[in-house]
A protein has these predicted regions:
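Binuclear metal-dependent phosphoesterase catalytic core
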Residues: 1-4, 90, 104-107, 133, ...
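Membrane-embedded segments
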Residues: 3-97
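Structural motif
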Residues: 6-8, 39, 111, 138-140, ...
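Catalytic metal-binding/acid-base residues of hydrolase active sites
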Residues: 15, 46-47, 76-77, 101-102, ...
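Short, flexible loop segments at the rims of nucleotide/cofactor-binding pockets, characterized by
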Residues: 15-21, 45-49, 116-121, 137-139, ...
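N-terminal post-signal-peptidase region of extra-cytosolic proteins
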Residues: 27, 54, 98-99, 123-128, ...
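Conserved beta-sheet core of the metallophosphoesterase superfamily
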Residues: 61, 146-188
């Protein structure tokens, strides 16, 4: 009941300066602000070069939400700029979640947000951070690729949010599908 009407904004795969340019970023920030979300969740693949990390997160920091901003890294973010992204997110008061959980509390109730570290490295990250959680809690799993949800047990997860597929489920500023999940069109 405490979270009745709770609004989540979710963005992923911005690929800033490749798919998303400066005008598009400013439009996105305005759109996010207008949504008046309670929390902003981000699914990774933020940039196309380390020099774009600071301006990207500086712009996203203009989106103020009562319960904060959380993000996981995408495959591009592990390939380059990982530490820059983590440090810049923290600098702007955002919380990177790499196989970690955090709890949103309101009037004695809670929502748990669990974030997955590099979902492509199942040897190191093949145990979901949700397994240790209580099935009584409402848990949001934040992961870069939806394939992780099929490849690994994500017990105790009530809602999973992922990006990566660029599958056109939601087109932002006319960007068309580019990469599909190996599970096809199963994910929306």
């Amino acid at each position: 009941e405490a979270f009745e009407g709770f609004r989540i904004a979710f963005i992923s795969d911005l690929h800033y300066k490749s798919l998303l340019k400066e005008k598009g970023l400013n439009d996105l920030v305005r759109l996010l602000i207008a949504q008046k979300a309670d929390v902003l969740l981000m699914g990774g693949d933020y940039q196309e070069g380390c020099e774009y990390v600071e301006p990207l997160f500086s712009a996203l920091a203009r989106v103020k939400t009562p319960m904060g901003t959380y993000g996981v890294m995408g495959n591009n973010d592990y390939e380059r700029c990982h530490d820059d992204i983590v440090n810049t997110m923290k600098h702007y008061g955002m919380r990177p979640l790499e196989h970690e959980v955090d709890t949103l509390r309101k009037d004695g109730q809670q929502i748990i947000i669990a974030g997955v570290r590099n979902p492509f490295d199942l040897g190191r990250n093949g145990v979901s951070p949700t397994l240790a959680l209580s099935p009584k809690d409402f848990v949001i799993l934040l992961v870069h690729t939806p394939d992780y949800i099929e490849d690994v047990s994500v017990a105790n997860t009530d809602l999973a949010l992922a990006g990566h597929t660029h599958g056109g489920q939601v087109r932002v500023f006319g960007v068309a599908p580019a990469l599909n999940s190996h599970y096809g069109n199963r994910f929306i």
